[in-house]
Swiss-Prot record:
UniProt superkingdom: Bacteria
Catalytic activity: 6-(2-amino-2-carboxyethyl)-7,8-dioxo-1,2,3,4,7,8-hexahydroquinoline-2,4-dicarboxylate + 3 O2 = pyrroloquinoline quinone + 2 H2O2 + 2 H2O + H(+)
Species for this entry: Pseudomonas protegens (strain DSM 19095 / LMG 27888 / CFBP 6595 / CHA0)
Protein name per Swiss-Prot or TrEMBL: Pyrroloquinoline-quinone synthase
Pathway info: Cofactor biosynthesis; pyrroloquinoline quinone biosynthesis
Membrane-spanning intervals of the chain: none
Gene Ontology process terms (BP): pyrroloquinoline quinone biosynthetic process
Length: 11
């Protein structure tokens, strides 16, 4: 999960 909105929300 590095190109997903969920991952982006974590960072």
């Amino acid at each position: 999960m590095t190109d997903t909105p969920l991952s982006a929300a974590e960072f």
